[in-house]
């Protein structure tokens, strides 16, 4: 199906630059069938609400046919919708409805690996001489029967699993049921490019590409070196996971990834489609972001992990991150997020007050780059407390209780307080329980409260959308004064001065020189007075001056 959309909607090839993207985790957004699991028809129902937030696009996490061992990130058919979520016709309705509301659609493509139930893998493991025998990463055991090297899986244990049929190991960077595709095989690359074209022809406007730095591996299968203790962190894997003990020099970040990304960009170009690549690396994430987004032949943007940090970011931390982006990716483009389907929701993670949550929201909309917001974030949802017996996430089950997994950020969206399921589903039991603590923050109640965070999100998004300087302008070097973050964004016709107090204290700053005006008092922006700019705790200041 080719969905026709207006020229004005589709013409701009740079629509992604500075875009606000709303992430939907479909299992948890809206159930239309009564089975306790969200679906595509549910998304269609809620698209008017999404459009009302002022976002540019939605990103839908995987909905493809899957055994759901990793909740859709283990694909068994790239060209169909899992019956749990509906049909291809339902997906076409998502495209049509989103476009009718001026919202673009990005889908989450998982190309580094498939499910072990994919026909490709079933054929590949059957013998060493079939047409797809080289489509996955197979290797002989060492003489003592142990795996070919020391590579580790993010989900724990060796990254190699024994297959008695082939009498070889296969590589899996994630679950044993998620075998890695062999990108050194040209036929694999072409098959995946054909998948991309299938969805582009169906009307999608772009892709969120899962784990793009895992596509290629070292063909010699050399051991990863030990990572010095002082360089280890839990950016990508929880601290209890020994995955953090290696420098993943050979298992990912292969330079030949760039060759495939060029091919992918060429496929997307005629459609004016855009891709945001997820780069998961605990030591070199921003450097890889720069490598993968520099110029106009690779990724349009990369999803950055630095603001998904466990510790609440200080002004100095944010300045250091942005300085490094300018240093290693000055010609690239980052996509920022505070929350997603893999991390503890940021109001809980950072222990934010209401004022701090509002200020971080405003700050996000002023940063250079594109922005992803995660469903329920606009309601101020805290992380849900999910009992062990209700856990679904294999990651959490494996490392419980030191790491409780990702279910706490994946509980169903709350639309109203009328029943225990918050308007998400009519089922007696939902796939994850709805958090009772979330019911009082439902969309219906938040809409009725003019002081709720949802209205602040709308205003902050509207600020970004109404100023090209904030969407796609340049950014001055950032500075820090008494815990305040200060920078200026500039476009062709205006400059916007941004100051954010990331402390619990009142701070007095010097007023910037020039004819500056407060541009949005609804965001609690401070105004200059008596030659000073007095910022209360967790208060922003957004000023504008015209250049023409």
Regions found by a protein language model. Give the residues of each.
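C-terminal beta-strand-rich structural cap/linker in extracellular carbohydrate-active enzymes
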Residues: 529-548
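Acidic/aromatic-lined carbohydrate-recognition and catalytic surfaces
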Residues: 2-197, 201, 214-283, 413, ...
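Generic enzyme active-site microenvironment
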Residues: 106-107, 208, 276, 337-338, ...
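Solvent-exposed beta-hairpin/edge-strand motifs
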Residues: 512-523
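Loop/helix patches that line or flank the sugar-binding groove of alpha-linked glycan CAZymes
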Residues: 2, 15-18, 220, 224-253, ...
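Surface-exposed beta-strand/loop patches in extracellular or lumenal glycoproteins
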Residues: 502-514
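Hydrophobic residues within beta-strands of alpha/beta enzymes
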Residues: 58, 207-209
